[in-house]
């Protein structure tokens, strides 16, 4: 019985040490990976994301990355959403009818 407990403790200890070694190896700390292997143009693109995307586009991207469902509002171009008044053709009733036609 004590031999089984000893083997179990050794196994748990080795598993814990192995898991911690993997977590802190190859620049992977605190959930972030080292971006040293990225090409310079990709690094520049990542750093300039605020300049590339409009606030509307960032909100849509965040909404999708959070795993929320795709709605009609996501399909409307941002330049239309940024205006204060929607065009008469894009009322909620007309959008629903248009979406029903495609499904």
Swiss-Prot record:
The main location is: secreted
Question: Where in this protein does the record say Asparagine amide is found?
Answer: 30
Extract one GO cellular component term from the record. extracellular region
Biological processes, Gene Ontology terms = neuropeptide signaling pathway; positive regulation of heart contraction
Q: What tissue specificity is annotated for this entry? A: Expressed in corpora cardiaca (CC), corpora allata (CA), antennal lobe (AL) and gnathal ganglion (GNG) (at protein level). Expression in CC and CA detected in all animals, expression in AL and in GNG in some animals.
Coiled-coil segments, which residues?
A: none
Name the Pfam families for this protein: Corazonin
Q: Which residues form the propeptide?
A: 34-103
Positions carrying Pyrrolidone carboxylic acid: 20
Q: Name one GO molecular function term.
A: corazonin receptor binding
Q: Residue span of the signal peptide, if any? A: 1-19
Name the source's superkingdom.
Answer: Eukaryota
Where can this protein be found? Answer: Secreted
Keyword 4Fe-4S (UniProt): no
Q: Which UniProt keywords apply?
A: Amidation, Cleavage on pair of basic residues, Neuropeptide, Pyrrolidone carboxylic acid, Secreted, Signal
What the protein does comes down to: Cardioactive peptide. Corazonin is probably involved in the physiological regulation of the heart beat.
For this chain, the family text in UniProt reads: Belongs to the corazonin family.
Protein name per UniProt: Pro-corazonin
List the source organism.
Agrotis ipsilon (Black cutworm moth)
Q: What is the lineage of its organism?
A: Eukaryota, Metazoa, Ecdysozoa, Arthropoda, Hexapoda
């Amino acid at each position: 019985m004590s031999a089984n407990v000893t083997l179990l403790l050794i196994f748990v200890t080795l598993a814990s040490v192995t898991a911690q070694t993997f977590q802190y190896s190859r620049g992977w700390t605190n959930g972030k990976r080292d971006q040293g292997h990225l090409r310079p143009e990709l690094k520049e693109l990542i750093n300039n994301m605020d300049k590339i995307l409009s606030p509307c586009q960032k909100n849509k991207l965040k909404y999708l990355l959070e795993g929320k469902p795709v709605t009609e509002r996501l399909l409307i171009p941002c330049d239309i959403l940024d205006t204060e008044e929607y065009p008469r053709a894009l009322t909620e009733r007309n959008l629903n009818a248009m979406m029903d036609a495609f499904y």
